[in-house]
C-alpha cells in the first residue's frame, strides 16, 4: 500500500492501536521548557512516578529568560519560580538542561536542530505549538498540552489519532528580496488561518528543494498558523549535509545506516492526499501582516483592504475588528505607517542566516532615533557565530540592541514587551491582540 511521509512515520511508531483508530505512539524526543512543564513534574511526584527515558528528554530555558542579563531574578518572581523549578526537576529526574548559565542556552526549537537532536523519521513533541519547526527535517513534530507532557515523561508514549494528509507544492522562481517567511505568509493568506485544521501538511516542490534547512524550518514553523497539526518536508541531500557532524547526529557506521533509512522517508508517488494545492510564487512580493491574524496579509506594495472585500461574515467582522485594534484605515499603505519598535528574533527567524540577511540591509545605515530595535539570537551558538562574523557590530552601529538568546518579544511573557498602542515590525510568528504586550500592535 502506498503511503505519505506522514503515514510512514506515524505507522512505524504505533505501540498499540484500538478499534477506533486511536494509537499509542512512541516518542523519540521530548523537548521541555520552564513554562509548560512544572505541573507535569509535580503530578509525577504525587503519583510517585519516574521519567521513563530521561536520555530522550531535553530541557532549556527560553520563554521567560531576560535577554539583557543572565540573572534568574531579571524577569520577575513568577519567571524566577518557573526557572528554579525546571532546574530542580531536571536535577531530580536526571534530564539534560541548558540553563541560563549554559553558553548554548536558547530557544528550544533552535537548539535541537542545530545540535543534531532533531533527526528524520522521529516523532518529536514539546509543550509549545511551534514544535512543528522540526518537521523541516522529515520528522513528525507537534505541540502538546501539560497533561500530555506528564504522560510522555511517564511513558515515552502518547495517544494520538491519525490526521488527514495535505500536500502544498510550491513552484516557480523565487523573486529577489522574497524570503521563506514571505512564502509561508502568502500560503497562509491563500489557505486561511484554519485552512490546515485537521491536517498534517507536507510541503514540496522545486522551491522547497532549493531552500536551506533554516528556510525550511521557517516554513514548517508557521504551518501551525494555518491550523495544521504539523508541517513536514521530506529529507534530502540538503538535510543530510546540515546534520553531518552535529553533536547529537549519528556518526561512523551509524551515519551510513541512518542515511539509508532517511532516504526511504518520502511520500510514495501514488500516495493519496486528502487535499492538494500548487502555489506559484514567481511573482511574489515581500509580505507583511496588517491585522491580528496570521492570514491577514498583504504584499508590501498593496493597500490595506476594506473589510467588505472579504467573503464571509466571519472574515468581514474579523477584518473590521483588526482594523480598529491596529488603528489602521483601509486603502492606506503600510509603508506609510510609522513604527515604534523592531524585533528580529523568535523560533521563526533568529538563526544565523536570518541575522546575516538582516545585517546586509543594515550595513552602513542608521535606524531612526525614534525607533527602539532589538536583535535576539535564537541560541548561544547563533550568538557566538554572529559575533565571530562581526554581525553584532553591524547591528549595534546601525542602532539596534544586541541581546542574549531567548524567546524575547515574540510573546509578552518576559520584560521585552510593547506598551499600549505601540507598533512593532516583528520577525516572529504571531500577530494576535496583545501577543507582544497588552495593547501592542504587531
Swiss-Prot record:
Gene Ontology MF annotations? 3-isopropylmalate dehydratase activity; 4 iron, 4 sulfur cluster binding; metal ion binding
Cofactor dependence: [4Fe-4S] cluster
Report which superkingdom the organism of origin falls in. Bacteria
Q: Its Enzyme Commission number?
A: 4.2.1.33
Cofactor binding summary note: Binds 1 [4Fe-4S] cluster per subunit.
Reaction equations catalysed: (2R,3S)-3-isopropylmalate = (2S)-2-isopropylmalate
Q: Does the keyword Glycosyltransferase apply?
A: no
Keywords, sorted A to Z: 4Fe-4S, Amino-acid biosynthesis, Branched-chain amino acid biosynthesis, Iron, Iron-sulfur, Leucine biosynthesis, Lyase, Metal-binding, Plasmid
Note the SUPFAM superfamilies from the entry.
Answer: Aconitase iron-sulfur domain
For the ligand ([4Fe-4S] cluster), the binding residues are 347, 407, 410
* Disulfide bridge positions per record: none
Q: What is the main EC category here?
A: lyase
The question of whether Amino-acid biosynthesis is a record keyword is answered with yes
Q: Which GO terms describe its biological process?
A: L-leucine biosynthetic process
**Hey, which pathway is this one from?**
Amino-acid biosynthesis; L-leucine biosynthesis; L-leucine from 3-methyl-2-oxobutanoate: step 2/4
Q: What the protein does?
A: Catalyzes the isomerization between 2-isopropylmalate and 3-isopropylmalate, via the formation of 2-isopropylmaleate.
How it assembles, according to the record, is: Heterodimer of LeuC and LeuD.
Q: Give the similarity note.
A: Belongs to the aconitase/IPM isomerase family. LeuC type 1 subfamily.
Protein name (Swiss-Prot/TrEMBL): 3-isopropylmalate dehydratase large subunit
Q: Which organism is it from?
A: Buchnera aphidicola subsp. Uroleucon helianthicola
